Curated annotation (Swiss-Prot):
Coiled-coil positions: none
Organism ancestry: Eukaryota, Metazoa, Chordata, Craniata, Vertebrata
Signal peptide (UniProt feature, chain positions): 1-30
Record domain Ig-like V-type: where: 31-143
GO molecular function, one term: identical protein binding
UniProt entry tagged with the keyword Disulfide bond: yes
SUBUNIT field: Self-associates. Interacts via its Ig-like V-type domain with NECTIN1 Ig-like V-type domain. Interacts via its C-terminus with AFDN. Interacts with TIGIT.
Protein's organism: Mus musculus
Membrane-side (Cytoplasmic) residue stretches: 369-508
Name of the featured protein: Nectin-4
Gene3D superfamilies found in the cross-reference section: Immunoglobulins
Gene Ontology biological-process entries: cell-cell adhesion; negative regulation of natural killer cell mediated cytotoxicity; symbiont entry into host cell
Subcellular location, principal: membrane
Recorded family membership: Belongs to the nectin family.
Segments crossing the lipid bilayer: 348-368
Length: 508
């Protein structure tokens, strides 16, 4: 009766403490506990704390006591698993600690910690009491991962022409600290900074760029990596760069189509911008003609008349800037010859210009060719004169050699020494010239040249020259003025003052 009374007086917590203290007594044996050094769980998931005793087959596990080891508070009871009385849990962990679902091994002392939170991180101890081996204990660390929840914040409005500007920033906080990067084809720079908290760390990454219209509409993606995530988290931001392109007008590519009576003529204003631009059409020299319709960027005309001629202005604007583009429309009247395009005249002018260019080119070619041939002729003439001079000098030397040797003088030359009868010689030469045939003159001249060449070869090159020889050379030079060289022979120049000596045709 007193034992039962005492049992009634003790509450469940007292029995838990008693059993937990009893689990720390025993003796050492050869069995071992199978546990993990670190148990990792994601925030909100269930954490399994493993503790399995592996010993002899005849050994029995009496109880398994779980406690949390706190550096500040010491050992704090968590739960007690008894082979006979079942599981007893500390009221602080009521409904959070339980056994794994069946089937369960009697040697398995593992427990489940439901809905793990960051406060559950820490060191846990498992102590197993066996019979007859005694008690065994092991410690493990519970790590709770806190996945980050990234957020992306766009920077200030981007405008074309700005310098380096913040495009967006991405922040992620978790435990441990997450990794934040950027995925984009846009050229820019990124920088990161981190902040540490008691149970987590926050990382913020910023992306800077120089805005341009090519970046408008491009994706900028923040990528967050963390061990608590099954895959990277991505947040995409579409860049919006404010710009306004230059304006232009299309529709006047062929001015000849703008004639009186044409229907469906339009002018279209072309431009791009962010935000999308607005269009406005005006006429520079007055209001828009009646019947002209404005529909956004397009200006539509009724059947054309000469009144539609004028200067039209397209005005493009958005919140950033404005642009203008103007064109001149001239509506042609086919019945007015003054305004028709004279294609024939234009063709004639073009042909005339081409012909003039070709003529100028031909003149240049002719002048260049004439100068070239003139220069070549001068060179040939100069060369010919040099050769002729050399030939004359050789002939003079041969004649001199022929007359200086008295043994080589023919008998027919005796008549030349009769200095007292010049008149008779002159008369005879005149008669002889009139009576001789051309063939005789050619033969006699060739004979004389051959005789001179033969006698020149017989002379000694080392013979000295006297003053008398020089006088004779001068006379021979004067006599050679009456000869002409043709085809390697000397021919007498046709003159009435020539002296014919003998019948062999020697002219002096």
């Amino acid at each position: 009766m007193p034992l039962s009374l005492g049992a009634e007086m003790w509450g469940p917590e007292a029995w838990l403490r008693l059993l937990f203290l009893a689990s720390f007594t025993g003796q050492y044996s050869a069995g071992e506990l199978e546990t993990s050094d670190v148990v990792t769980v994601v925030l909100g998931q269930d954490a399994k704390l493993p503790c399995f005793y592996r010993g002899d087959p005849d050994e029995q596990v009496g109880q398994v006591a779980w406690a949390r080891v706190d550096p500040n508070e010491g050992i704090r009871e968590l739960a007690l698993l008894h082979s006979k009385y079942g599981l007893h849990v500390n009221p602080a962990y009521e409904d959070r600690v339980e056994q794994p679902p069946p089937p369960r091994d009697p040697l398995d002392g593992s427990v489940l910690l439901r809905n793990a939170v960051q406060a559950d991180e820490g060191e846990y101890e498992c102590r197993v009491s066996t019979f007859p081996a005694g008690s065994f204990q092991a410690r493990m660390r519970l790590r709770v991962l806190v996945p980050p929840l990234p957020s992306l914040n766009p920077g200030p409005p981007l405008e074309e022409g700005q310098g380096l500007t913040l495009a967006a920033s991405c922040t992620a906080e978790g435990s441990p600290a997450p990794s934040v990067t950027w995925d984009t084809e846009v050229k820019g720079t990124q920088s990161s900074r981190s902040f540490t908290h008691p149970r987590s760390a926050a990382v913020t990454s910023e992306f800077h760029l120089v805005p341009s219209r090519s970046m408008n509409g491009q994706p900028l993606t923040c990528v967050v990596s963390h061990p608590g995530l099954l895959q990277d988290r991505r947040i995409t931001h579409t860049l919006q760069v404010a710009f306004l392109a230059e304006a232009s007008v299309r529709g006047l590519e062929d001015q000849n189509l703008w004639q009186v009576g044409r229907e469906g003529a339009t002018l279209k204003c072309l431009s791009e911008g962010q935000p999308p631009p607005k269009y406005n059409w005006t006429r520079l020299d007055g209001p828009l003609p009646s019947g002209v319709r404005v529909k956004g960027d397009t200006l539509g005309f009724p059947p054309l008349t000469t009144e539609h001629s004028g200067v039209y202005v397209c005005h493009v604007s958005n919140e950033l800037s404005s642009r203008d583009s103007q064109v001149t429309v001239e509506v042609l009247d086919p019945e007015d010859p003054g305004k028709q395009v004279d294609l024939v005249s234009a063709s004639v002018i073009i042909v005339g210009v081409i012909a003039a260019l070709l003529f100028c080119l031909l003149v240049v070619v002719v002048v260049l060719m004439s100068r070239y041939h003139r220069r070549k002729a001068q060179q040939m003439t100069q060369k010919y004169e040099e050769e002729l001079t050399l030939t004359r000098e050789n002939s003079i030397r041969r004649l001199h050699s022929h007359h200086s040797d008295p043994r080589s003088q023919p008998e027919e030359s005796v008549g030349l020494r009769a200095e007292g009868h010049p008149d008779s010689l002159k008369d005879n030469s005149s008669c002889s010239v009139m009576s001789e045939e051309p063939e005789g003159r050619s033969y006699s001249t060739l004979t004389t040249v051959r005789e001179i060449e033969t006698q020149t070869e017989l002379l000694s090159p080392g013979s000295g020259r006297t003053e008398e020889d020089d006088d004779q050379d001068e006379g021979i030079k004067q006599a050679m003025n009456h000869f002409v060289q043709e085809n390697g022979t000397l021919r007498a120049k046709p003159t009435g003052n020539g002296i014919y000596i003998n019948g062999r045709g020697h002219l002096v």
